[in-house]
Amino acid sequence: MSDSTPVRAPRHPGIYLLPNLFTTGAMFAGFYAIVVSIGGRFTDAAIAVFVAALLDGMDGRVARLTNTQSEFGVQYDSLSDLVSFGLAPSLVMYNWSLSSLREYGPLWGKVGWAAAFIYAVSAALRLARFNTQVAVIDKRYFQGLPSPAAAAVCMSFVWSMDNFGVSGPALDMFTPVTAVVVGLLMVSRFRYYSFKSLPMGDKVPFLWIIVGVLILVPFFVDPPRVLLVVFSLYLLSGPIVTLWGLTTHRKRQRRGVI
């Protein structure tokens, strides 16, 4: 090869289009939630975060069904989750309620944005921890409240209150507590059931159909309040399951000693 022969740069590998379109859609929904919340459309913002959660749940399944999993997709999905379930809920809550704390004085104003930041950084830490432990943790459980579920708790709360006609400023003392508690649950060590071991492709007892109908009918009648109840129960399940497991383990240890 002569000195004058041009050297071709190595070609960069492409990315899979279909699953990453779902991921992009989820990120756009989170971004949209932030934008419309600035304009005071809080119900639309909350619904957008739920749309993001739906798309986020589909991108991984699409990748597995089409055999298009990639490390790029994993990292891109994580960044999308940070926008949709970290930044979007924190800023929606800030625009809806937390920003009104500044009316009590400069210090209270800082409490408002600090609560929003604690939620956002907790989501970031939760996602980073998940990415580093995904190969070693028990697939049946999540460690800490998953960020989509945390976002669902907060956004169903905003959605329900907005439907009731309750303004964010009327709850400006409750919202920061909610944001901080939910944020801390994301980085906690409480175990939350992942539902990954459910037999989705297998036959199930007929009773499961009845249970599904009993859940779906109220959901279509009053979506925000049903979502708030369901995800609040899931939020509480982590501490309850973890403490129950510790209590049972200690009882077994005592029996073994005796």
Annotated model-derived regions:
Residues 18-23, 50, 65-127, 157:
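Multi-pass membrane catalytic core of lipid/isoprenoid biosynthesis enzymes
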Residues 32-47, 89-114, 157-174, 220-225:
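Helix-coil boundary and interhelical linker segments in multi-pass alpha-helical membrane proteins
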Residues 4-14, 38-44, 69, 104-113, ...:
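Short juxtamembrane and helix-loop transition motifs at transmembrane-helix boundaries
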Residues 113-153:
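Hydrophobic, well-structured mid-protein blocks that either form specific transmembrane helices
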Residues 1-57, 241, 258:
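Topogenic membrane-insertion module of multi-pass membrane proteins
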Residues 28, 54, 58, 62, ...:
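Active-site His/Glu-centered metal-binding helix of metallohydrolases
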Residues 22-25, 45-49, 112-122, 150, ...:
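Hydrophobic alpha-helical transmembrane segments of polytopic
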Residues 1-7, 139-258:
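C-terminal membrane-associated helical module and adjoining short loops/tails
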